[in-house]
Amino acid sequence: MIKENKLKKIIKDGGCAIGTFVKFNDPSVAEILGIVGYDFFVLDNEHVTMNRESMVEMIRGANTTDIVPIVRVRKNEDVEVLQALDSGALGVQVPNVDTFEQASNLARYAKYTPDGTRGFSPGVRAAFYGQMDKHEYVKFANENTLVVSHCETVTCVENIDEILTDRKSVV
């Protein structure tokens, strides 16, 4: 589902977004959160493992409303990020990002060339199963994908100024 990321706009405009973590698989929960006015939810796939089909169903539930689905992946690996985004998530949150290098890698994994190294497959759900011009889709996806490096350790706090120098790794 091609959908503009309203959460990125709220952040860019300095606004306040309301969201929550979701730790179980029921697409109606995603739908209800959107209906009652939440701006986003983070599908926690780090602490609660669900298969890709379940993740897609949760994102489909979100797509019935205006809520932004973000997937917290298990680890900072290109395939983890790729599968979440190809499933239709409008962003990824990656745990335990401690260094500038890790944050930069994450940003590259989440964006298509020229901004990153994300693998391109036009036939996936996020690309509307190939029904959108590929150049338009790549531009749209790069502009609308939210990338969140989750700072959870003392090491990250010590490196935060350096991590924040790469704006692509934050938003």
Could you say what each language-model-derived stretch is?
Residues 34-35, 85, 164-165:
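Non-catalytic positions within long, well-ordered alpha-helices that form the structural scaffold/packing
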Residues 11-27, 69-74, 145-162:
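Active-site mouth loops of central-metabolism enzymes
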Residues 29-57:
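Glycine-rich, proline-tolerant flexible connector loops at the mouths of alpha/beta enzymes
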Residues 170-171:
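Conserved small/polar residues in nucleotide/adenosyl-binding loops
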Residues 43-46, 73, 94-97:
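Short beta->alpha connector loops at strand-helix junctions that form conserved
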Residues 52-86, 110-116, 140-142:
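Alpha-helix-loop-beta-strand connector modules within alpha/beta enzyme cores
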Residues 79, 91-167:
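Conserved anion-binding
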Residues 1-19, 132-144:
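N-terminal amphipathic alpha-helix/helix-capping segment at the start of soluble metabolic enzymes
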